[in-house]
Amino acid sequence: MRILVTNDDGFDSPGLHALARALKPFGELVVAAPDREYSGASSSVGPIPLTTEKCRVAIEGIDEAWAVSGPPGLIVFLASMDAFGAPFDLVVSGINPGANVGNPVYLSGTVGAAIVARMVGVTGIAISQESVNSLVETFSDHQTNEQKWETAAHIAASVVSN
């Protein structure tokens, strides 16, 4: 099984890293995530630039990882056109630091990536978790670093394994 892991928080997100490591045993895994923050991007794919930059990045324990100059919806769309090799069987987006519940779920780039996956005929899963204390989107922040990333990653892995 080929698995694409993405998010809306950028390739340096600790939630993305934990998720990728947890899903690695389930197939050929590729990480392709935005080169910067795209929270609130929903399932947007544009405006589509004439060129979209992608560059290899290092994530500990992951063989193939890319930083892409675009929102997660565009990344999933590009993946459906073989921008990262053969077609994917599954797209998993997250782990988002924030619950993504209620009406704001429609604005979530994390959820948007899963929606675009479904639109291109691939199963998509979005993983979010409530933040410690308050919503924090800066990954150097002490509260975000206290998130229980491994717990959410373990739950995601159990969903994928079934």
Give names to the regions the model predicted.
Residues D9, E37, P71-P72, N96-A99:
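Short glycine-rich anion-binding loops that position phosphate/pyrophosphate groups of nucleotides
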Residues A99-S108:
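Glycine/threonine-rich flexible loop motifs
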Residues T6, A32-P34, S93-N96, A126-S128:
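Short beta-strand segments
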Residues M1-D9:
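Nucleotide-activated donor-dependent transferases that construct or modify glycoconjugates
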Residues L90:
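Short, Asp-centered acidic motifs that coordinate Mg2+ and/or phosphate
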Residues I3, P14-D82, A86-P87:
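A cross-family phosphate/adenosyl-ligand binding-site feature
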Residues M119-N162:
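Glycine-rich, Lys/Arg-enriched anion-binding loops that position phosphate/diphosphate groups
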Residues A113-R118:
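Hydrophobic/aromatic ligand-binding patch that stacks against planar heteroaromatic rings
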